[in-house]
Each structure stands twice: as C-alpha cells, then as structure tokens.
C-alpha cells in the first residue's frame, strides 16, 4: 500500500509501529513516536516498500538522528521538513532513488549542523512535570548512559527515574546557597540538573542538601550520575549545572550524529 499524503501516513501509524517493523527497526520507530514526529512517515513507508531491508534500517536510524536534532532539540519548521520528505518519497516510488547512497544527499538540508545543535541544546530546558517530557529526558539520559557505560536501560523500567539534583521543591535556602530566585526556574529543568537514580535512592534522598546527595551519587551504578560525585563533589550551583550540561551536550553531539551528512 502506497501512502499519497502525510495525512494518510498519520492515520496509518498504528500499523507503522506494530506490524511493519521488528527488532531494532521497531525500536527506532518507537523512538520517533516518543519524539512525536510524524513528518517522515510517507518517506519511511515508501523506503520500506522499495529499498533493501539493510538500506531501510540505515535510513530509519538516520531519520531518528535528524528528528532528534531538527524536531526535538531545535524545534524547527515541520512544514519545510515535510516537503523534503515527501519529495524524496515520490522519487523512491518512481524508481529515481533505489538505494541509500542516492538518498543521502537529499537529506543534508534537514541535518542540523553541530554548532547549531550544540548551541541550542546548551540552553534547552525540559519541564519534567510533563509526563511525555519526563520520558524524553529518560531517553536522552539512558542513551548517554549506554554510550558511557554500556548499560542498556529499559526506558519504561520502574526501577529508576529522573533525579533533580537541585530539587524542584528545595527545603531550606541554607542547603542551596548558590541558588537565587532568578535562577530557580531555569536551573531546575536544565539537562545539567537532571540525572538517573534508582527509585529507592531517589525516594530516600528526597530534597536533601547536595552534600548528602553526592554521597549517594558516588555509589550509583550509572556513570552519568557517578560523574557528578567525581567532578562536582564540593558544591552545586547554576554555573556547575551549565558545566555539566556542556558535558552532556558534547556527548549528545557524538551520539546523535550521521557522519555521511555532517559537513565540515
């Protein structure tokens, strides 16, 4: 079945996730669902029908990276993106594109360059009170964790959750002397202030002072969290949050990257 419009592709999305793909392809497709990105549906369904399974799997991984940079972090126009995807889908359907190498040059316009991606991500905040955003943050941190330690965490596992290092509801101002009102809303929801922690540890440390929290971080099995105890054990402040955000973004630039599309 060929989809002739993005609207049809959106309507076809349950089959897109549940029946078309399996294994790693299904995992990548579900990541697009997590991103709430629908613009590449028509392209992916055309590619699944016409390209080799190997080329399709490669394309799907590339689309996930493009979507993370373009849609999730930079939040750029979906209309422009949709037009490009639809043009490529038509070329695949008409037989003008028959393999991934012919397709790649057409995706370059949608691949956000490292500097723009980095600069935007450095200033990004994530309101983790929103359930979908919270899940997105878990995806980002678990992906970075896998790259750092090799631990592949199940995204929906109840055994761990998101820890706000500077708490959402800090108890005493004396426990967090580096934070003033101007910083609170910004600092709390920056990725640099968020980390992974077991559900048990997170519950037990609650809104404790950083001097108490860091002792728990030091024993944590997650590298992304142990890093805090190893590098920022003296204090926690807005400046340090920015420093850690810089570290996490640097990792992200390497992880969500397509070398064939990167231009020097």
Give the residues covered by each predicted segment:
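N-terminal low-hydrophobic presequence detector
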Residues: 52, 158-161, 264
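Betabetaalpha-Me/HNH-type nuclease active-site subdomain
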Residues: 92-228, 235-237, 255
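A sequence-composition feature that detects small, non-aromatic residues
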Residues: 9-14, 29, 46-47, 67, ...
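A cross-family structural signal marking well-folded subdomains
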Residues: 1-138
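C-terminal, well-folded lobe of enzymatic/effector domains
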Residues: 54-63, 68-72, 76-83, 109-115, ...
């Amino acid at each position: 079945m060929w989809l002739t419009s993005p609207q049809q592709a959106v309507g076809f999305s349950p089959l897109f996730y549940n029946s078309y793909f399996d294994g790693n392809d299904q995992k990548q497709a579900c990541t697009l669902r997590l991103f709430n990105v629908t613009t590449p549906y028509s392209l992916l369904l055309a590619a699944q029908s016409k390209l080799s399974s190997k080329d399709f799997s490669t394309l799907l991984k590339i689309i996930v990276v493009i979507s993370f940079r373009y849609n999730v972090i930079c939040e750029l126009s979906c209309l422009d993106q949709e037009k490009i995807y639809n043009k490529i889908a038509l070329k695949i359907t008409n037989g003008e594109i028959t393999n991934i190498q012919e397709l790649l040059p057409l995706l370059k316009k949608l691949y956000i360059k490292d500097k723009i991606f980095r600069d935007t991500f450095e200033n990004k905040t994530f309101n983790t009170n929103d359930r979908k955003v919270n899940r997105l943050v878990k995806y980002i941190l678990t992906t970075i964790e896998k790259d750092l330690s090799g631990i592949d965490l199940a995204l929906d596992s109840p055994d761990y959750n998101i820890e706000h290092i500077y708490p959402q509801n800090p108890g005493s101002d004396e426990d967090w002397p580096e934070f003033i009102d101007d910083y609170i809303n910004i600092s709390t929801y920056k990725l640099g202030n968020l980390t992974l922690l077991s559900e048990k540890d997170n519950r037990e440390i609650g809104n404790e002072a950083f001097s108490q929290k860091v002792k728990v971080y030091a024993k944590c099995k997650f590298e992304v969290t142990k890093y805090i105890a190893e590098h920022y054990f003296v204090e926690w402040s807005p400046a340090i949050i920015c420093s850690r955000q810089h570290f996490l973004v640097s990792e992200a630039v390497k992880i969500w990257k397509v070398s064939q599309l990167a231009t020097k």
